UniProtKB/Swiss-Prot annotation:
Active-site residue numbers: 144 (proton donor/acceptor), 172 (schiff-base intermediate with substrate)
Catalysed reactions listed for this entry: L-aspartate 4-semialdehyde + pyruvate = (2S,4S)-4-hydroxy-2,3,4,5-tetrahydrodipicolinate + H2O + H(+)
BP-aspect Gene Ontology terms: diaminopimelate biosynthetic process; lysine biosynthetic process via diaminopimelate
Site feature (Part of a proton relay during catalysis) residues: 54, 117
Recorded name of the encoding gene: dapA
Pathway listed: Amino-acid biosynthesis; L-lysine biosynthesis via DAP pathway; (S)-tetrahydrodipicolinate from L-aspartate: step 3/4
Quaternary organization: Homotetramer; dimer of dimers.
Keywords of this entry: Amino-acid biosynthesis, Cytoplasm, Diaminopimelate biosynthesis, Lyase, Lysine biosynthesis, Schiff base
Lineage: Bacteria, Bacillati, Cyanobacteriota, Cyanophyceae, Synechococcales
Protein name: 4-hydroxy-tetrahydrodipicolinate synthase
EC number: 4.3.3.7
Keyword Glycoprotein: no
One MF term in the entry's GO annotations: 4-hydroxy-tetrahydrodipicolinate synthase activity
Length: 302
């Protein structure tokens, strides 16, 4: 195991679930289901909960809906888990305001995505994140790099320059490569807590310095994901690898099409009335739902 996995801070624990946003039959946010789901996820091993991220369908939620959801989840779990709010935007002014509101609402941290669509250069990205950090200096920030959705990527050297902001404490690596984790660790040192942003890469990323995962799969496989991470940290590589191998078919099914379409279907299969995604996303096809159900059943048998 890498020293970074044990020496780096874990400001939000090891397993952070990127929560879905439940909708009722009318398409409105269902705060009651969200609260119940939040408590369930903590019982299943989540140290932290992220509301209104990619999985939470933030692009189709109003800021008022996002704030209500944050408050409902915060009230539901109390001090039993860290609660992060997705406050990113491709408008710096909007991201600053959302982050300040999240801090005032009692969030334990904010996930701030690289600005999407307008593709700022590195100096623009640095100024963007610095403005957010300075606007809410007491709120720990997790920078979020997901170039497949945003169209641009923040460089490790840019992140390193931002480390003089005391509240830039963590990074969600969702570029799909372990190389990003290595580059960040070398550029920023062990004080930056790097989280895998890809369920299937959690174990490989732990091996090169990540401290945990911001997970989608933990909605339905929280205990197994937690056990994999703990086995690795305890030096039991064989058990960690066996759990990784057992989880991969589920992860493939959960990302067979655009997230969060499959995970909402998985929750419905487990009896959670979270509703379909808001348009322009859609429900999971019957064929994919059968494959997903089979993958969930196979994991239960391991």
């Amino acid at each position: 195991m890498t020293q970074a996995a044990t020496l780096s801070p874990t400001p939000f624990g090891r397993v952070v679930t990127a929560m879905v946003t439940p909708f009722d039959a009318s398409g409105a946010v269902d705060l009651s289901v969200a609260a119940n789901l939040a408590r369930h996820l903590v019982e299943q091993g989540s140290d932290g909960l992220l509301v209104c991220g990619t999985t939470g369908e933030s692009p189709t939620l109003s800021w008022d809906e996002q704030l209500q959801l944050l408050q409902a989840v915060r009230d539901a779990v109390g001090s039993d888990a860290k609660v992060l709010a997705g406050t990113g935007s491709n408008s710096t002014a909007e991201a600053v305001e959302a982050t300040k509101e999240a801090a005032a609402a009692g969030a334990d941290g904010a996930l701030v995505v690289v600005p999407y669509y307008n593709k700022p250069p590195q100096e623009g990205l640095e100024a963007h994140f610095r403005a957010i950090a300075e606007a809410a200096p007491e709120l720990p920030l997790m920078l979020y790099n997901i170039p497949g959705r945003t169209g641009c990527s923040i460089a490790p050297a840019t992140v390193a320059r931002l480390m003089d902001c005391p509240n830039v404490v963590s990074f969600k690596a969702a570029s799909g490569t372990t190389e990003e984790v290595t580059a960040l660790r070398l550029a920023c040192g062990p004080q930056l807590a790097i989280y895998s942003g890809d369920d299937g890469l959690t174990l490989p990323m732990l091996a090169v310095g990540a401290v945990g995962v911001v997970s989608v799969g933990s909605h339905v496989a929280g205990p197994e994901i937690r056990a994999m991470i703990e086995a690795y940290l305890n030096g039991d590589g064989a058990s960690a690898l066996a759990l990784h191998d057992a989880l991969i078919p589920l992860f493939k099914a959960l990302f067979a099409t655009t997230n969060p379409i499959p995970v909402k279907a998985a929750l419905e299969l487990n009896g959670w009335s979270v509703g379909a995604p808001r348009p322009p996303l859609c429900s999971l096809s019957d064929d994919m739902k059968r494959s997903l159900s089979n993958a969930m059943a196979a994991l239960r048998q391991t």
